[in-house]
């Protein structure tokens, strides 16, 4: 289905199932972290999936392409992003499989039935409100800083929304790993699988991907790290595979 583009918008090919997404370079375009998170979710994942802070809907659309789930919901608080994500869903004729809902992450368990999701994903703001320089663009500031919600909010709501044994998948920065693991465990979300992401094989980690299970037993698998570049400007085969090239 063709949809109307607003001023400054463009349509990008996602290289998956012919899916496309509407973006506005003057707003907040999705980055590699969202793609890596989608690739970290096992393809066999089915049932109901919720993406907290979905932005323009990139993660739900990629999960529809990569997993067995046909019941995916994206929750987003910013009206412009909600509207844009909805048009991307219609653009791909996925209205029957993906729903975009406007709402606050802090109120997610009031918007949706508790213990009703098999999996939750989130690419949350990485920086605390007092960390780093805030972007003058409100849209970008909300996406990058914990302006409207904290990771504590994300973990708390996730624990209420997941079914017992349900999975939580997130991407975040290594400098907050210890804090995030403590927060997860405080909400009965047991870390089960961790993958560090490095720009180069000999560089420090720049991101981590983590899977947690609600009510799971202790015991975490540390996976082989993901390396982004073979050399400057040249992606590794694993990155090409995740992107579908």
State each model region's role.
Residues 2-44:
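Class I SAM-dependent transferase core
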Residues 22, 99-101, 192-195:
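General small-molecule cofactor/ligand-binding pocket signal
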Residues 28-30, 55-56, 202:
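Short glycine/threonine-rich catalytic loop with a Thr-x-Gly-x-Asp
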Residues 37, 123, 154, 212:
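Residue-level signal for inorganic ion chemistry
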Residues 40-133:
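Conserved SAM/SAH cofactor-binding pocket of Class I
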Residues 124-153:
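Mobile active-site "lid"/loop adjacent to the S-adenosyl-L-methionine
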Residues 148-199, 203-205:
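Conserved Class I SAM-dependent methyltransferase catalytic core
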Residues 204-245:
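SAM/dcSAM-binding transferase cores
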């Amino acid at each position: 289905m063709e949809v109307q583009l607003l001023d400054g918008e463009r349509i990008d090919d996602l290289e998956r199932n012919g899916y496309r997404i509407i973006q506005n370079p003057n707003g907040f375009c999705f980055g590699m972290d969202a793609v890596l998170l989608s690739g970290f979710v096992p393809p066999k994942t089915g049932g109901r999936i919720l993406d907290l802070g979905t932005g323009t809907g990139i993660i739900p659309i990629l999960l529809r392409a990569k997993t067995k789930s046909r019941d995916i919901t994206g929750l987003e608080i910013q009206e412009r992003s909600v509207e844009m994500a909805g048009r991307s869903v219609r653009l791909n004729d996925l209205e029957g499989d993906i729903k975009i809902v406007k709402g606050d992450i802090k109120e997610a368990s009031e918007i949706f039935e508790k213990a009703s999701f098999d999996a939750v994903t989130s690419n949350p703001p990485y920086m605390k409100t007092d960390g780093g320089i805030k972007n003058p663009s409100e849209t970008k500031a909300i996406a990058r800083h914990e302006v409207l919600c904290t990771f504590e909010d994300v973990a708390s709501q996730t624990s209420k929304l997941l079914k017992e044994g349900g999975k939580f998948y997130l991407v975040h920065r290594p400098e907050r790993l210890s804090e995030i693991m403590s927060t997860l465990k405080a909400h009965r979300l047991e870390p089960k699988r961790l993958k560090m992401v490095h720009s180069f094989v000999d560089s420090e980690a720049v991101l981590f991907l983590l899977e947690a299970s609600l009510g799971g037993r202790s015991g975490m698998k540390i996976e082989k790290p993901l390396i982004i570049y073979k050399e400057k400007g040249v992606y590794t085969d694993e990155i090409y595979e995740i992107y579908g090239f």
